[in-house]
Amino acid sequence: MERTYPYAWIIPFIPLPVTVLVGLGLLVVPNATKKIRRMWAFISVLLLSIALLFSINISIQQIGGSSIYQYLWSWTINNDFSLEFGYLIDSLTSIMLILITTVGIMVLIYSDNYMSHDQGYLRFFAYLNFFNASMLGLVTSSNLIQIYIFWELVGMCSYLLIGFWFTRPSAANACQKAFVTNRVGDFGLLLGILGLYWITGSFEFRDLFEIFNILVHNNTINLFFAALCASLLFLGAIAKSAQFPLHVWLPDAMEGPTPISALIHAATMVAAGIFLVARLFPLFINLPYIMYFISLIGIITVLLGATLALAQRDIKRSLAYSTMSQLGYIMLAMGIGSYRAALFHLITHAYSKALLFLGSGSIIHSMEPIVGYSPDKSQNMVLMGGLTKYVPITKTTFLLGTLSLCGIPPLACFWSKDEILNDSWLYSPIFAIIAYSTAGLTAFYMFRVYLLTFDGHLRIHFTNLNGAKSRSLYSISIWGKEESNLNNTNCFLSEINKNDEKVFFFSKKTYKIGKYARNRMFSFSIFFGNEIVFPYPHESDSTMLLSVCVLGLFTLFVGFIGIPLNQGIVDFDILSKWLTPSINLLHKNAHYSVDWYEFVINAIFSVSIALFGIFIASFLYGSVFSSFKSLDLINSFETKGKKRIFLDRILNVIYNWSDNRGYIDTLFSLYLTRNIRKLSELTHSFDKRLIDGITNGVGVASFFVGEGFKYVGGGRISSYLFVYLSYVSVFLVVIYYFVL
């Protein structure tokens, strides 16, 4: 019984040896460490697998009905202050442990091949293992101080990995942007922690919740101050989980390697904010205004993220805005008190989004030898299309992740999102309408990404990458500004140098990736006489596909752990059993179940909205659009005059909103960043001219006084003695007449 619990403190330290040994190896014996660099990937996977075994054992005990376990070590104790460190094992901890270790293992296996060409391979694995260790430490923390320490470590690792390719100016700027934005949230979190300690006198979660509840129920607390502290705590979660308005760092974070994008969006950085809200849920639930504020931020983020994803060309940024929107759903669920649905969607979204990001990495990996290693080209969906026959396994798994995020049964996200939608309707019809509408938008933009990537023809061979001005041959927006004409290759061929010189599809400005780069014979276009041989994408290697396929299985089956169907014979709802200790703390005698009729009616409505979004995306981007266009149905619609012009204006507004990131970055740049820079310049000028002027003036004055005395003295000792005695005499006279 609970034999694993006393040793659970080991879990956060299990991945650390790789970070320490790689760091020491690169400092002491760099050449020997680099020669065995691929070995560190195996060790990383092995150690994290050991952590997974611990996590599975703990989770089985939690599902079996084990109680909450906490162990503390006293750090410092006196009469007025005590600080303890330890670990807390409950259902929330066990869920997060499983999530971090499973996704982390898949990312490690995937990264071994994905990063094999990079000179920073060892540095990447050192950061990655430290990232996993920090997140494991965060979810097992037993008090707010411990959480804050690991919170900062998680942030530090994310900054290092976002700016991993720091020689790229865009990556360096993205790292800086993530750091500055999260500083705002982290400062709020620190103030909130100090405020809660002022109220309760404790950092430990159990004591803090108990004391806070007593104070609220007895009305012996200033509710405004308590709400302010809770808001500051939530500010940390807003920044970490990329909620409005501190979401601006998330799209730029795509400058990091794709495996890191998968880990950040699935199980670490953005999940940390959700975890904090879930951990402090017993505190927030006593403050109704804070719960409403959480739900409001969530619903705004749901809609904003979906609208910003509509017109993105970068495949990773499209997925980033999707993450922002889905995390908004989770925050909405937390705010309306649907604790179970929030954690359920956290689980299902994590596996689906990890699958999509690793799938996008496989796509990027296949496109890089053709278009070059610039993210502007290898991640650009304009240059993709028709990849189904080149990367069939990636296509199948990517489709699974897309359908899951769209909310199509029986895939994972269908079960959790449907539960959030139903609960939101009970809480607020307005919130429910926005949530249901965004579900349709989610289906639209996700299927848009899928169709632009895999449907149609490979557009790279019909696109001019050499900088010559030419009309685009394929429309990638829904606004109908340009028509597709993939059959006419004369436009492309006319751009080729008439002297029959070799034409490369590489960008003229490429990024050096080191001596480990793969040498692929089919990575460029060559002329053989008058015939052009085009390169084509290729399927990823087996280790990358293994991770993608395993995550595909999770996406297929993980939703079944939370099926809310209990007819008295078989209870499929493993998640409720898993969460029983935590749910009982929040709601006494709580039991979650839904009958068949209600469940089916709600599911039909939500799936219909998702299918409508998929239909619109297929009509505008898929083969259906081409078929209708050949029948001139679109052209007949275009002749409707004023109605068509009005519709185009609306679509252009939506397009510009999405393409310009909702103008939020622009507003921050104009009114916040610029003013802060001016204030910094003003304070710098004040410091340089006044503060430094006083300090330097004293030094300069002393110098000139010394020089004057030097010339007066002339170097004779008798003169020095005369001046010295004169000063002493004057001093004694002054003392005698004015003091005595």
Swiss-Prot record:
The keyword Plastid applies. The chain crosses the membrane at residues 9-29, 40-60, 89-109, 125-145, 147-167, 185-205, 219-239, 258-278, 290-310, 327-347, 354-374, 396-416, 425-445, 521-538, 545-565, 599-619, 720-740. GO terms for molecular function: NADH dehydrogenase (ubiquinone) activity; quinone binding. GO terms for biological process: ATP synthesis coupled electron transport; electron transport coupled proton transport. It catalyses: a plastoquinone + NADH + (n+1) H(+)(in) = a plastoquinol + NAD(+) + n H(+)(out); a plastoquinone + NADPH + (n+1) H(+)(in) = a plastoquinol + NADP(+) + n H(+)(out). InterPro entries: NADH_UbQ_OxRdtase_chlpt_su5_C, NADHpl_OxRdtase_5_subgr, ND/Mrp_TM, NU5C-like, Proton_antipo_N. GO terms for cellular component: chloroplast thylakoid membrane. Coiled coil: none annotated. Keywords: Chloroplast, Membrane, NAD, NADP, Plastid, Plastoquinone, Quinone, Thylakoid, Translocase, Transmembrane, Transmembrane helix, Transport. It is a multi-pass membrane protein. Its EC number is 7.1.1.-. It is found in: Plastid, Chloroplast thylakoid membrane. Its main location: plastid. NDH shuttles electrons from NAD(P)H:plastoquinone, via FMN and iron-sulfur (Fe-S) centers, to quinones in the photosynthetic chain and possibly in a chloroplast respiratory chain. The immediate electron acceptor for the enzyme in this species is believed to be plastoquinone. Couples the redox reaction to proton translocation, and thus conserves the redox energy in a proton gradient. Belongs to the complex I subunit 5 family. NDH is composed of at least 16 different subunits, 5 of which are encoded in the nucleus. This is NAD(P)H-quinone oxidoreductase subunit 5, chloroplastic. It comes from Piper cenocladum (Ant piper). The gene is ndhF.
